[in-house]
């Protein structure tokens, strides 16, 4: 029996049916599955501006496949627009709001399945958390990647604009050049074009089996993206008939596959946070140490921005995520018996994919010639991060740095110092009280890291924070430091000028002071007053878990 029978069957449900008749149901439609289409459409960001077209195509295809689609809206936050402002504190919060809203709408109306459509970064994990919580048949449709901007012979992304700010501040480009980059960085619809957070998470979801093969790297404006959205609706109707549910797919092995692909494509640090959160909702025992274990055996084989040369549309032309997965599968680095929403195993899905990438491209490298021999997201531990932290070590020349701490209590204070040339080579920049509780909301530090790169300090300065980093960040950056400063973590005890060691080779992050002094500082520490007492940020700060556990808000 369909779950929607709770609102469509029996004489007692006559009032319920009366409401449904008003939105287009006829007598015969009450026997059809009701599919929710969770539409993240918004004109605030290029990431989501094209979603309405995909939603309409999905709606039409679901109806033709014998279902009754019911569309409802969910929110988005544009990280690119809110970046570097107080508004960025709402970004990670929006992941929870999206998950809560999809769960609420689907469960309140007893929907039989859900097709979630999203574009910007938090849309993907928000939808996946909801699918895992509800465990009703579901499919995710990614809005698609933006095409690269062009300026002379350069491919641009939005990160080019952030880095240009630092270049302008250090006198490397003039205002006219800055404006030219600004005007050409984002040429149309789609999510930020490198292997940043949105494209990383879409690749992870394709690997997990809850979106269709090849769909995670398609360009937003190409016809194949709309066709894939329609096909996704058809697959969802079949999944309802076959009772294929998210928890059938979201196994520990599936998460290990997703981590392997994130490493192989050089994906965002945010994947650690989001995969931990999705796994928690799915009841899967995934921990931060699993990322380090997998990193040690999976190389980076894709040469993608932010630290590489190519953008996601180039990856798609080179064979997309299936080509990446085929190499990993053949090398024994993926679990081939994991299934996708079509009911096919990974091994079945990849059987016709070439074992080696085409020699006519160099976006995807063969495993024998990786971009980096090991994964790029290292989990460091030490007295500064007893629960762990995430270091992105792709594109760095110096994996070990010991230097004096430059301590900032906010992103804004740090950015001002960088733009005023007060951060020097050899410094270890510390931005604290930006964690899940302390921020609250764990802002991304793209503005400071881009300014550092723009000032030609990317391989000379380290930056550590209890906040996050954008998927567009590269250099020696360490985020998600846990415990965070606001709950008494050691990062809150660092003084200006203290010696700090970051050793990505030894997986160490260390405050180099005597234990007696550490204990003295710890005893003197007082919990700071919350920055927000009310509203969504106040509520979030009271509920959110440590970043080492995914920064979730529905922990028991």
From Swiss-Prot:
Mg(2+) binds at residues 79, 121-122, 444. GO terms for biological process: isoleucine biosynthetic process; L-valine biosynthetic process. GO terms for molecular function: 2 iron, 2 sulfur cluster binding; dihydroxy-acid dehydratase activity; magnesium ion binding. The keyword Metal-binding applies. Belongs to the IlvD/Edd family. Homodimer. This is Dihydroxy-acid dehydratase. It comes from Prochlorococcus marinus (strain MIT 9303).
């Amino acid at each position: 029996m369909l779950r929607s029978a709770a609102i469509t069957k029996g004489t007692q449900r006559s009032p319920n049916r009366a409401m449904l008749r008003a939105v287009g149901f006829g007598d015969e439609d009450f026997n059809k599955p009701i599919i929710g289409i969770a539409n993240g459409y918004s004109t605030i960001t290029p990431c989501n501006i094209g979603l309405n077209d995909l939603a309409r195509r999905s709606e039409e295809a679901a109806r033709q496949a014998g279902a009754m689609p019911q569309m409802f809206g969910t929110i988005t936050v544009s990280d690119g627009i809110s970046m570097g402002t107080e508004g960025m504190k709402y970004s990670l919060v929006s992941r929870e709001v999206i998950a809560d809203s999809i769960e609420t709408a689907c469960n309140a109306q007893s929907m039989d399945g859900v097709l979630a459509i999203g574009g910007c970064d938090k849309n993907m994990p928000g939808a996946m958390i909801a699918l895992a919580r509800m465990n009703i048949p579901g499919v995710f449709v990614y809005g698609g990647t933006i095409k690269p901007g062009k300026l002379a012979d350069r491919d641009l992304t939005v990160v080019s604009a952030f880095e240009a700010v630092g270049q302008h501040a250090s006198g490397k480009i003039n205002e006219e050049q800055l404006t030219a980059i600004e005007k050409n960085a984002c040429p149309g619809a789609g999510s930020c074009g490198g292997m940043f957070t949105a494209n990383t998470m879409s690749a992870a979801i394709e690997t997990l089996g809850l979106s269709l093969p090849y769909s995670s790297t398609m360009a937003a404006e190409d016809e194949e993206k709309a066709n894939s959205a329609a096909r996704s609706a058809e697959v969802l109707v079949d999944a309802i008939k076959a009772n294929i549910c998210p928890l059938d797919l979201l196994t520990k092995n599936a998460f290990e596959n997703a981590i392997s692909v994130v490493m192989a494509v050089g994906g965002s640090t945010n994947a650690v946070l989001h995969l931990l959160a999705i796994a928690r909702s799915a009841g899967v025992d995934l921990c931060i140490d699993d990322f380090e274990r997998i990193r040690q055996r999976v190389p980076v084989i894709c040469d993608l921005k932010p630290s590489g040369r190519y953008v996601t549309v180039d990856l798609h032309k080179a064979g997309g995520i299936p080509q990446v997965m085929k190499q990993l599968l053949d090398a024994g680095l993926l679990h081939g018996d994991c299934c996708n929403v079509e009911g096919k195993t990974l091994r079945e899905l990849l059987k016709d994919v070439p074992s080696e990438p085409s020699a006519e491209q160099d976006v995807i490298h063969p495993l024998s010639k990786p971009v980096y021999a090991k994964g790029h997201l290292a989990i460091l531990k030490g007295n500064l991060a007893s629960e762990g932290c995430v270091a992105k070590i792709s594109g760095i020349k110096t994996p070990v740095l010991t230097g004096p701490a430059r301590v900032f209590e906010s992103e804004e204070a740090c950015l001002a110092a960088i733009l005023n040339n007060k951060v020097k080579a050899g410094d270890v920049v510390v931005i604290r009280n930006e964690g899940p509780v302390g921020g609250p909301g764990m802002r991304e530090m793209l503005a400071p890291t881009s300014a550092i790169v723009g000032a030609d300090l990317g391989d000379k300065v380290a930056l550590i924070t209890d906040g996050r980093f954008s998927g567009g960040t590269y250099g020696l950056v360490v985020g998600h430091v846990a415990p965070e400063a606001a709950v008494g973590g050691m990062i809150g005890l660092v003084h200006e000028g203290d010696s700090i060691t970051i050793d990505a080779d030894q997986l160490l992050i260390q405050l180099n002071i005597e234990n007696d002094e550490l204990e003295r500082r710890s005893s003197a520490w007082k919990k700071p007053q919350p920055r927000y007492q009310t509203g969504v940020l106040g509520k979030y700060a009271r509920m959110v878990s440590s970043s080492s556990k995914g920064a979730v808000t529905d922990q028991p």
